[in-house]
């Protein structure tokens, strides 16, 4: 498992020294020209998926392609509802699904995982009940190359639990949280060292 620090500024890049991977959120800051000596995930999140990018899809994909050429990321994060043509990047693809209202049932999430076009699938849904925890655990135990967790303060533990169920990444923050229930990089590192 690798610790991913989600970044929204160059100052946070300095705070992410202990991260294994950095997620460069170009919807929050223009990282072009930034020197990053770690594995990188390039993300430009739409407003509907918890980000700040407000333009149309064509503009967003073009922005990502320009940033791709400048930053040379190891991964690009693309939403699961995009057409196949958007998945034309020469790197590993994280196909992501976000739901800030609820956690869909297992069969719907299973469809997302089994229909994936990316190398990894990231599922982040709003947690409301124990049943939601069960749904995410089922996805993680039945599939490989899946990052899946529940959003919300009450369910922040699922971010670490997911790593022990095979999730390749734990998304963390440095500076300030970028999503509901996101845990700090320092806290994640401490929890992992205590759990072994």
From Swiss-Prot:
3-dehydroquinate binds at residues 23-25, 45, 159, 182. GO terms for biological process: 3,4-dihydroxybenzoate biosynthetic process; amino acid biosynthetic process; aromatic amino acid family biosynthetic process; chorismate biosynthetic process. GO terms for molecular function: 3-dehydroquinate dehydratase activity. InterPro entries: Aldolase_TIM, DHquinase_I, Type-I_3-dehydroquinase. It catalyses: 3-dehydroquinate = 3-dehydroshikimate + H2O. Coiled coil: none annotated. The lineage of its organism: Archaea, Methanobacteriati, Methanobacteriota, Archaeoglobi, Archaeoglobales. Its EC number is 4.2.1.10. This is 3-dehydroquinate dehydratase. It is an enzyme of class 4 (lyase). Keywords: Amino-acid biosynthesis, Aromatic amino acid biosynthesis, Lyase, Schiff base. It comes from Archaeoglobus fulgidus (strain ATCC 49558 / DSM 4304 / JCM 9628 / NBRC 100126 / VC-16). Pathway: Metabolic intermediate biosynthesis; chorismate biosynthesis; chorismate from D-erythrose 4-phosphate and phosphoenolpyruvate: step 3/7.
